[in-house]
């Protein structure tokens, strides 16, 4: 009777064993085979390939040549795509740095300093604490007058007891509110101005308040803003474009004067060598020439002598 199942060497009947699964061969006279009355040939284990024989995955670049020195086909060598530096999937990192405020040096406009050189740079936060009963407006104005930097009001929290607001629909009039009002938002700015040589501050503030009954009032601050509880005001100081233009050092132009050309006289020519004077009374003594001709003397050994030419001298006879 033919069946589609395969009898495993262990004696059980199961489905087809996958090719990756291999079992060690058992002798044909095992008890299981004798019990089933079957005689199966021993199974041969496949020889491992060259890559599996090592048992470890090779690290590094793939091999370009086989063990016998023959080059591998191009299809067997995997192609490794080189990653382009500074780009991620076609996206330029430099453009992203410029978008979020990075410089080419890697620094970012941060809180508490940042990088100088751009308009609105050097942004520094400050926290102003206003005590109970003090005027918030005067504290902020006095803080802005401590230096040449411009300030902007970011936020504030606390409760006020008295506020004077300027309403746009009241034809330039003001309204004063008394009671306990919680600050919802406080914003504004103060910048340094110069008019006819005198420096001052220009700017203003606007506030939104919530009453105890839930009513919300707001407008431009036109007078007092008295604190009912300690209030924290967060402001930021920065340098404007006008101040930055004045702070830029001007480069001094240095003009190099042309060097004067001095005429150098040529060196004097050396005088002709002076001849030695021979004295007939003392032939072995020669009179030295003048002092200026000493440097032009030459060694007597270097001068060629003619042995055929002699000097005849007549000496007096005693």
Swiss-Prot record:
Map motif Bipartite nuclear localization signal onto the chain.
56-64
Q: Name one GO cellular component term.
A: nucleus
Q: According to the UniProt entry, which residue ranges have a biased composition of type Polar residues? A: 288-312
| SUPFAM superfamilies attached to this UniProt entry | AF0104/ALDC/Ptd012-like
Give an example GO molecular function: minor groove of adenine-thymine-rich DNA binding
Point out the DNA-binding stretch(es): 56-68
Cite the residue spans of the region called Disordered.
1-76, 241-318
One Pfam short name: PCC
Subcellular location as annotated: Nucleus
Domains (record comment) = The PPC domain mediates interactions between AHL proteins.
Q: What name goes with this protein?
A: AT-hook motif nuclear-localized protein 7
């Amino acid at each position: 009777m033919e069946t589609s199942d395969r009898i495993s060497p262990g004696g059980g009947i199961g489905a087809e064993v996958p090719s990756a699964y291999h079992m060690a061969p058992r002798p044909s006279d095992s008890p299981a085979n004798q019990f089933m009355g079957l005689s199966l040939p021993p199974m041969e284990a496949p020889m491992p390939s060259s890559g599996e024989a090592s048992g470890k995955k090779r690290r590094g670049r793939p091999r370009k040549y086989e063990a016998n020195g023959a080059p591998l086909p191009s299809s067997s060598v995997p192609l490794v795509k080189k990653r382009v530096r500074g780009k991620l999937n076609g996206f330029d990192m430099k453009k992203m740095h410029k978008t979020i405020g990075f410089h080419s040096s890697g620094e970012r406009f941060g809180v508490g300093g940042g990088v100088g050189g751009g308009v609105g740079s050097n942004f520094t936060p400050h926290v102003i604490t206003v005590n109970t009963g003090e005027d918030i407006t005067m504290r902020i104005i006095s803080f802005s007058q401590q230096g040449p930097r411009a300030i902007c009001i970011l936020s504030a929290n606390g409760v006020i007891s008295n506020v004077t607001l300027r309403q746009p629909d009241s034809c330039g009039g003001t309204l004063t509110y008394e009671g306990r009002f919680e600050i919802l938002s406080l914003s504004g700015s103060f910048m340094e101005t110069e008019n006819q040589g005198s420096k001052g501050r220009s700017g203003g503030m606007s506030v939104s308040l919530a009453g105890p009954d839930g009513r919300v009032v707001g407008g431009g601050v036109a007078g007092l803003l008295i604190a009912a509880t300690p209030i924290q005001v967060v402001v930021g100081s920065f340098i404007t474009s006008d101040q930055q233009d004045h702070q830029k050092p001007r480069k001094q132009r240095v003009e190099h004067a042309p060097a004067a050309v001095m005429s150098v006289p040529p060196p004097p020519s050396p005088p002709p060598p002076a001849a030695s004077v021979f004295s007939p009374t003392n032939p072995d003594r020669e009179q030295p020439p003048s002092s200026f001709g000493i440097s032009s003397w030459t060694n007597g050994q270097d001068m060629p002598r003619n042995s055929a030419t002699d000097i005849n001298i007549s000496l007096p006879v005693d």
